[in-house]
C-alpha cells in the first residue's frame, strides 16, 4: 500500500462519508443533487500501440473518464501502462490519470495454466503467458520488461497509488454515480471489493467484457481464439469475487462482442479525417473482433443495446476441466450462493455502433494541449 493512499485513509473516507450522510439526514431540507455526468473508471489490460477502445469514452462529450486503471492480462502490467500512457499523449489527454494495478492474478499462474493444458486442452491465447518470441512481443518469464514500442516510450508517468485504492476513492467521492467498466481480467476490481466491502454497492454499476457462455461448440465451428473467455479464466477467483458482490447492476458484454471485426473498410472511414489518433489507430489495428470497443461504446451509449437476457452468473473455480468457465442459470435452478443476476447483452445496433466509433475516433485532437 502506498504511503500516499493507505488503508487507514480509505477508512477515514468511509467514516467521513457516514458522518456527512448523517448530517444531511438530520436537516429539514436537503438540496437537490446536481445532475451527474456519465462518470466512468475504465479498467483494462491495455496492450499495443493503439488503444482504440478508449475512443468511445474520450470522444464522447457526455462521458467523464475519472481514470484508467491497468491490470496484467494480454500483456504485463508495466508494458500495458506504458502503452496507454503513450496513446493518451498522442490523443492529448494526459489530463486523465493512469493508475497501475495488479501484476499477477489472485491464484492462477503460468505454471498452473501449463499444467491445466497438459491435462485437459490447449489454450490458444494466454495473454502475458504466451510463448516468448524473437522480438519480445511476449515475454512470459520477465514481467518487468518493456519492449520498444513503434510509437516510442511515454514521457508521462502513472499516478501514485494502486488501482484498487483509486477505485475505492472515486466511488466514495461520487457515490452511486461511477460506472466501473472492465475489459480485462477482474483482479483490480476484486481487490477493491476485498479492501472495502462497500465498494460495489457505492458504484453505479459494473459493465464488463466477459461472460462468454456456450463457447465449446463455437471453438469447433469457428475460431478457437475468438471463442474464449480470456478475461475470466485468466483470474477465475477474481471473477467469482466480482460476480458475487452487491452491485446495483451488472452488464456482461460477451459473445456479442465477437460480432463486429475490424476491417480495411472501417479503417478507411476512420482515416478520412487525418489526426494523430486516426493515423495511429489505422496503422496498428488488426483484423480482430472489436471486443473492448463494443464494451466501451455500450458504457458511453447504453441505447446501442438492442437485445439482452437476464440470468444468474458465476465462474467455476474448481481446478478441473471447467476451471474459469462461466455458468449461467435461470432463477429456478440457480444455486443462490451469492451469485447475482446479470444483464447479458445479446444484440447491438451494429450500424450505429460503427458510425459512432468512427465519429469518436475522429474527435478533434487539441493542438495546444501538451
For each feature predicted by the language model, list its residue ranges.
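A charged helix-plus-loop insertion that forms the helical arch/lid used to bind
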Residues: 115-134
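N-terminal secretory signal peptides that target proteins for export/translocation
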Residues: 1-10
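Glycine-rich beta-alpha junction loops
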Residues: 102-106, 187, 210-213, 254-261, ...
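Active-site histidine-anchored catalytic micro-motif
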Residues: 35-94, 109, 135-252
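Bacterial N-terminal signal peptides
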Residues: 15-26
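Conformational coupling and interaction surfaces
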Residues: 35-38, 52-65, 230-370
Amino acid at each position: 500500500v502506498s504511503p500516499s493512499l493507505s488503508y487507514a485513509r480509505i477508512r477515514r473516507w468511509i467514516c467521513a462519508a457516514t458522518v456527512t450522510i448523517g448530517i444531511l439526514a438530520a436537516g429539514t431540507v436537503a438540496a437537490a443533487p446536481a445532475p451527474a455526468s456519465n462518470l466512468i473508471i475504465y479498467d483494462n489490460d491495455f496492450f499495443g500501440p493503439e488503444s482504440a477502445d478508449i475512443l468511445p469514452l474520450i470522444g464522447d462529450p457526455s462521458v467523464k473518464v475519472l481514470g484508467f486503471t491497468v491490470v496484467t492480462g494480454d500483456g504485463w502490467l508495466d508494458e500495458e501502462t506504458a502503452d496507454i500512457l503513450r496513446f493518451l499523449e498522442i490523443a492529448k489527454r494526459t489530463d486523465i490519470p493512469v493508475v497501475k494495478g495488479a501484476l499477477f492474478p489472485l491464484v492462477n499462474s503460468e505454471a498452473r495454466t501449463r499444467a491445466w493444458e497438459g491435462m485437459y486442452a490447449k489454450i490458444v491465447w494466454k495473454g502475458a503467458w504466451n510463448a516468448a518470441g524473437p522480438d519480445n512481443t511476449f515475454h512470459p518469464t520477465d514481467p518487468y520488461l518493456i519492449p520498444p514500442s513503434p510509437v516510442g516510450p511515454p514521457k508521462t508517468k502513472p499516478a501514485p497509488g494502486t488501482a484498487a485504492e483509486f477505485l475505492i476513492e472515486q466511488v466514495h467521492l461520487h457515490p452511486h454515480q461511477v460506472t466501473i467498466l472492465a475489459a480485462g481480467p477482474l483482479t483490480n476490481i476484486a481487490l477493491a471489493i476485498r479492501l472495502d466491502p462497500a465498494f460495489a454497492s457505492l458504484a453505479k454499476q459494473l459493465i464488463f467484457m466477459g461472460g462468454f457462455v456456450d463457447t465449446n461448440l463455437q471453438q469447433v465451428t469457428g475460431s478457437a481464439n475468438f471463442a474464449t473467455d480470456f478475461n475470466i479464466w485468466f483470474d477465475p477467483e477474481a471473477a467469482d469475487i466480482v460476480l458475487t458482490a452487491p452491485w446495483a447492476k451488472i452488464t456482461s458484454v460477451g459473445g456479442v462482442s465477437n460480432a463486429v471485426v475490424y476491417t480495411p473498410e472501417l479503417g478507411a472511414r476512420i482515416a478520412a479525417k487525418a489526426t494523430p489518433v486516426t493515423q495511429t489507430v489505422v496503422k496498428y489495428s488488426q483484423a480482430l473482433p472489436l471486443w473492448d470497443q463494443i464494451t466501451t461504446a455500450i458504457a458511453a451509449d447504453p441505447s446501442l443495446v438492442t437485445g439482452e437476457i437476464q440470468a444468474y452468473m458465476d465462474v467455476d473455480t474448481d481446478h478441473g476441466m471447467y476451471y474459469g468457465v462461466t455458468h449461467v442459470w435461470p432463477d429456478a435452478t440457480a444455486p443462490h450462493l451469492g451469485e447475482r443476476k446479470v444483464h447479458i447483452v445479446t444484440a447491438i445496433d451494429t450500424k450505429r455502433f460503427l458510425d459512432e466509433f468512427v465519429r469518436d475516433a475522429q474527435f478533434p485532437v487539441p493542438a495546444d494541449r501538451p
